[in-house]
């Protein structure tokens, strides 16, 4: 069964479940390129890296298991609250701080959090999954087929754009594929299969509880640790249909998310 694409790109259950210059500083990178800049001391993990020694496949698996395990109250951002996916109480031991998924946001939340200057940050821009509750054989391709239409996103740190996503589901060489207009500092990840556990009280609607084989596809930004001080992370999503062939059943979805971070040494 598909989830409502008005609010989610994720699908599952009994059906379907980011002047050229580079200044190298200790543990940080400064990028400048046409139309997109980077704030001082902000680094982005590239697609060829393993953030903190962990593959992107494993990060996707951890993200989905932790995000889906949250009930509606836990997954709802509160005014002035701190919604961190992989830490309901204290995130001090986590190497990467996981921010909320854009598909589940229907108003522009602002969260206020404290994190360490040793922690990286995961911003999921537009992501989906499928699992063995579906009769689809290729779970990764199944997840990929849920991310339809024109998908655009921008990530800013301290008001400075550092990542940009702009892809469009199109007919490419006679078959449907993504036309990439921009994939700057964004990691597109189509994961290997992993084990996904869905609890009875998950905040995701129309799910069948249980443990399944699953796969994920989507676009992420993996930020390297920020320097100590106050920082603001903003990321958004703009999903718009492109036609009955390239985005069947897709409804527009817009979300804007802000995290105000106190980064301690």
Would you name each region that the model predicts?
Residues 123, 231-235:
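A short tyrosine-centered beta-strand micro-motif
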Residues 1-13:
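N-terminal secretory signal peptides that target proteins for export/translocation
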Residues 95-198:
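Extracellular-facing segments of soluble proteins and assemblies that are Gly/Ser/Thr-biased and enriched
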Residues 152-228, 236-264:
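Extended, well-structured beta-strand/loop surface patches
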Residues 14-18:
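Short, hydrophobic alpha-helical membrane anchors of single-pass surface/secreted proteins
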Residues 19-35:
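Bacterial N-terminal signal peptides
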Residues 118, 228-229:
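Beta-strand-connecting loops/turns
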Residues 40-96, 253-255, 261-265:
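N-terminal segment immediately downstream of the Sec signal-peptide cleavage site
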């Amino acid at each position: 069964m598909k989830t409502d694409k008005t609010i989610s790109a994720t699908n599952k259950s009994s059906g379907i479940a980011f002047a050229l210059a580079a200044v190298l500083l200790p543990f940080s990178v400064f990028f400048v390129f046409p139309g997109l800049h980077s704030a001082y001391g902000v680094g982005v993990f590239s697609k060829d890296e393993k953030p903190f020694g962990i593959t992107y496949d494993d990060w996707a698996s951890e993200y989905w298991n932790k995000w889906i395990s949250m009930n509606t109250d836990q997954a709802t951002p509160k005014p002035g609250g701190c919604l961190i996916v992989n830490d309901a109480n204290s995130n001090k031991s986590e190497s990467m701080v996981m921010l909320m998924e854009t598909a589940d946001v229907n108003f522009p939340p602002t969260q206020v959090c404290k994190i360490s200057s040793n922690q990286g940050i995961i911003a999921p821009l537009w992501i989906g999954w499928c699992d063995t509750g579906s009769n689809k054989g290729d779970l990764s391709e199944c997840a990929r087929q849920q991310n339809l239409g024109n998908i655009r996103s921008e990530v800013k740190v301290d008001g400075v754009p550092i990542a940009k996503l702009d892809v469009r589901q199109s007919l490419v060489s006679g078959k449907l594929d993504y036309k990439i207009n921009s994939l700057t500092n964004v990691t597109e990840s189509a994961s290997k299969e992993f084990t996904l556990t869905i609890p009875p009280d998950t905040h995701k609607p129309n799910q069948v509880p249980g443990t399944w084989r699953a796969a994920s596809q989507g676009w992420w930004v993996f930020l390297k640790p920020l320097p100590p001080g106050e920082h603001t992370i903003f990321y958004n999503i703009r999903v718009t249909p492109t036609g009955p062939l390239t985005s069947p059943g897709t409804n527009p979805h817009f979300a804007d998310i802000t995290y105000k971070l106190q980064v301690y040494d």
